[in-house]
Amino acid sequence: VSLPVSKRVQRVKPSPTVALTGRVAQLKAEGKDIIGLGAGEPDFDTPTHIADVGVEAIRKGHTRYTPVEGTAELKDAIIAKFKRENGLDYGRKQILASSGAKQTIFNLILAVIDPGHEAVIPAPYWVSYPDMVLLADGVPITPYAGADQGYKITPAQLEAAITPKTRLFILNSPSNPTGAAYTRAELRALGQVLMKHPQIVICTDDMYEHIYWADEPFVSLASVCPELYDRVVTTNGVSKAYAMTGWRLGYCGGPIELVTAMATIQGQSTSNPSSISQKAAVAALNGDQSCVREMNKHFKQRHDFIVAGLNKLPGVSCLKGAGTFYAFANIEKAMSIVGVKDDNAF
């Protein structure tokens, strides 16, 4: 007898990234020599000075519940980071730490999307965004920007995607999967559109802030458009920059009423993020940042090597990215050469 599951779940596809990662793990367990290119995960170990603090936290008994939204110590480290690196001022009540930035964003989606509400998500996008909107009974709207636009939507595209039902705009820059990053001028232009639509909450996913090598310094929307400060939830985490994917620690800064709502949702799901991970995250955010710069240097070298190699393949083209550790190749001509109809078959 098959047991019924909700229509909500039936609308959502299992994460293809998780599925591919699981398949790679299975093949490795079978003794196959395979390289996994699925999950967005640094291959470096967590820097020793951070890992040591995590181990010390266990030994000193920092293994109990903390406040749902994170410890005061971690909040202060996040506040200092936002001020130091992004020019953003937040108080403790504006900060939420979660079990990964994925949870942070899901909390926000659940906090602002009612059934039938729309969320604008520029495509190409991280595969989880639309499904999280569907789980909230919302409708993902995905304006597409191709290689001819550098995988970045225009203000006109954003304006055209907005309706009276729009409640959320999600912007990931630098982008998973394209590596594209919006310039200060481009962010300002998108911000000018959003200023005309006060019902829209903006989520900026800045997870790849420190895996970045464009000539112009990284900037976040809330700092470029201070007029939108009261509507922007700036999300980030320690997973990518500090090679801490398994520690599961994300965070955000934003308007008190939204952050409070997100904390309420989190309090009824996971409660606080790991107390051990919080201690390690404090060490990451407050400590020596040379490890971040060193990893970024290697990611840039690998990026240049892979992109150059892809562009030598028949039927393949690949733009250079401004950051992240992804290469987003166009394989349309290659698919014609080998006689397949879509990228999954390829």
Q: Which stretches of residues belong to each language-model region?
A:
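PLP-dependent class I/II
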Residues: 1-5, 13-23, 27-34, 41-45, ...
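Substrate/cofactor-recognition hotspot
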Residues: 9
